[in-house]
């Protein structure tokens, strides 16, 4: 198995740092991306690392914030085969509170109509190598940094979040 960080908040090499996350993972059966980061940074850094994102067959979006899935639209344009696994609630509106303002940080909900996007509602087994699981309660893994994050119902409960087990 190989895991390469393509997008992260910090960097110690020639890759561009960006608020967000994208991991390129190779298993025996898959070339996948766990998250896509917020923008074109994932494509630029993949090119620097010699990774052909056209070869990616699976994408897992951890949750519905643009720092983890903002590059989804561009990825769908540049890769014509990967299946994208995402919790259905990830496409609901999400916000970050900045002073008195609620700044949208959600994903483009129009993308959920794409036939390659697989909308999930809870745990899901992709195959014997890849399993997705959710956490029922925000309290189990909450960070104080999340206290400024909201959805249309109030404080973000992260019911749109999923994790990848390899």
What kind of feature is each model-predicted range?
Residues 1, 27-31, 124-132:
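Beta-strand-turn-beta hairpins that frame and shape the catalytic cleft
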Residues 2-49, 157-166:
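Conserved beta-strand hairpin/beta-sheet module of binuclear metal-dependent hydrolase folds
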Residues 4, 60, 85, 118, ...:
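Hydrophobic/aromatic beta-strand patches that form the interior of the parallel beta-sheet core
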Residues 10-13, 41, 93, 138-142:
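Short, acidic Gly/Pro/Ser/Thr-rich loop/turn segments
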Residues 41-86:
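Active-site metal-binding motif and surrounding structural segment of the metallo-beta-lactamase
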Residues 52-55, 118-126:
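Short acidic low-complexity segments
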Residues 69, 74-77, 81-121:
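Hydrophobic alpha-helical segments and helix pairs
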Residues 98-102, 122-166:
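Active-site-proximal loop/helix segment associated with metal-binding centers of metalloenzymes
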């Amino acid at each position: 198995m190989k895991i390469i960080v393509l997008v992260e908040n910090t960097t110690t090499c020639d890759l561009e740092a960006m608020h967000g996350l994208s991991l390129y993972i190779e298993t025996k059966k898959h070339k996948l991306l766990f998250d896509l980061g917020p923008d074109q940074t994932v494509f630029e850094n993949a090119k620097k690392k010699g990774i052909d994102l056209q070869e990616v067959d699976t994408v897992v979006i951890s949750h519905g914030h643009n720092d983890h899935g903002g590059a989804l639209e561009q990825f769908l344009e540049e890769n014509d085969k990967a299946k994208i696994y995402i919790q259905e609630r990830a496409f609901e509106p999400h916000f970050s509170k900045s002073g008195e303002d609620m700044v949208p940080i959600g994903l483009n909900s129009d993308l959920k109509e794409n036939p390659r996007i697989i909308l999930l509602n809870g745990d899901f087994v992709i195959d014997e190598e890849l399993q997705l699981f959710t956490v029922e309660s925000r309290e189990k893994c909450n960070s104080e940094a999340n206290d400024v994050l909201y959805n249309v119902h109030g404080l973000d409960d992260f019911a749109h979040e999923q994790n990848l087990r390899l």
